[in-house]
């Protein structure tokens, strides 16, 4: 009977090749998910909804859950949102990360709590960002719409424009997905 086993060198090469392909196709599979609640350090604010945090010595981008900041093209609102987030979370700030999911870009999506206070609530109250549930479909436990409504009723931030500026998700959809949130 003839053996159908491949030589060891060929098997090792095939296994290595499959590992490389899987790491390219599924990059987050090699990263452990964050704990549901953990303390992380802010390294930088990338924009009004994305923060670079230190996960055990590795810098990773994370997106604030259940909100949408104005897009870079939506000035001055995008810069104002980023500036307000930088003011709330200067580099080196320790925060509690409450993991929710990963988005389509592979980013961790989470709530960030500073001394027990939800950073997103502050941004929404200031009228810096929009409440948005489009990515997760699981934001009903949060009162973000209430904070947005209060900012809108008092004409704070982006709500100084009647009705507010164009919603970022509408711009993204109109671009055929070319614009990245």
Question: What residues fall within each predicted segment?
Answer:
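Small beta-barrel nucleic-acid-binding modules, primarily SNase/OB-fold domains
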Residues: 2-7, 11-17, 22-181
């Amino acid at each position: 009977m003839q053996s159908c086993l491949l030589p060891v060198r060929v098997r090792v090469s095939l296994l290595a090749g499959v590992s490389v392909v899987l790491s390219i196709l599924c990059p987050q599979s090699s990263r452990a998910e964050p704990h549901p609640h953990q303390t992380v350090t802010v390294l930088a604010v990338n924009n009004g909804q994305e923060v670079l945090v230190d996960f055990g010595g590795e810098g990773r981008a994370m997106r604030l859950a259940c909100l949408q900041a104005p897009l870079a093209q939506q000035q001055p609102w995008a810069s104002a949102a980023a500036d307000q987030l930088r003011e709330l979370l200067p580099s080196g700030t320790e925060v509690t990360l409450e993991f929710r999911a990963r988005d389509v870009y592979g980013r961790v999506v989470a709530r960030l709590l500073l001394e027990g206070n939800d950073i997103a609530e502050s941004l929404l109250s200031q009228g810096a960002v929009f409440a948005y549930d489009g990515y997760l479909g699981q934001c009903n436990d949060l009162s973000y719409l209430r904070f947005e409504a209060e900012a809108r009723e008092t004409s704070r931030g982006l709500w100084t424009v009647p009705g507010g500026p164009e919603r970022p998700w509408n711009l993204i959809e109109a671009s055929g997905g070319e614009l990245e949130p």
